[in-house]
């Protein structure tokens, strides 16, 4: 059950303003992130992926993968939020879904101001579903670069409602981030990529230091035989595959990303991403080859395609 210093008050909760956060990165961070989601992991001179890590005319010219934007939200949830009458244990947090809108190509370095707001909260009895929206603005120009909506499942945080009707709040369009229906026909294209045994250790260098992904003893206490791969790392692999196979290698073609995390991936497993094109939307699902399990599903909206696809 959720614990609180005062009785839960929905009016106080909805009026509560979350503090702004700052995020600064440079070309080195961009390259480390790309390596963390498998760029050049199969072929160090793959021209489709080398551009995310290196540019002969200077690192400031490397291209940025759109899922790099997911890093801008780091810390908001894992460190715990000060919400009136609602507390949770960050160690019991499970990442359920990530939704990202990209408004302009991400620069290779930037200082950002993140404006964070509550997008949703639902009391599920023994657990709660919490959604945060983060809008990232370039410091100086004030230009809005992107928006993240992070959905997490909080074990043990439910039961905070002070009426017989479970508390439920959602503040975004109902058509955003919906679960996708996977087409029954054969996919347009399929990408297979093996993760490295050290993949989680490499990905954590981008700032997600949750010991669930690195500490064997911590993973066992959480019920896993060994450390698991970050869900956002799996998402990065999938979107990178879509950029390569559908967007002809152009990361700026990605407009919207939605991904639901269905089960865990272990570092070293092989990811198979299947893709279907419906207008300007790519529906995808990612499976673990070794266990034949679907681990991720969602969609990507793109800005346009050449007629030769």
UniProtKB/Swiss-Prot annotation:
Reaction(s) catalysed (UniProt annotation): a (3R)-3-hydroxyacyl-CoA = a (2E)-enoyl-CoA + H2O
Keyword Secreted belongs to the record: no
Stretches assigned to the MaoC-like domain: 183-295
Group of enzyme by EC: lyase
GO molecular function: lyase activity; oxidoreductase activity
Residues that coordinate or bind substrate: 95-96, 124, 208-213, 231, 261
Keyword vocabulary terms for this entry: Fatty acid metabolism, Lipid metabolism, Lyase, Oxidoreductase, Peroxisome
Places the protein is found: Peroxisome
Major subcellular site: other
Protein name per UniProt: Enoyl-CoA hydratase 2, peroxisomal
Organism: Arabidopsis thaliana
Lineage: Eukaryota, Viridiplantae, Streptophyta, Embryophyta, Tracheophyta
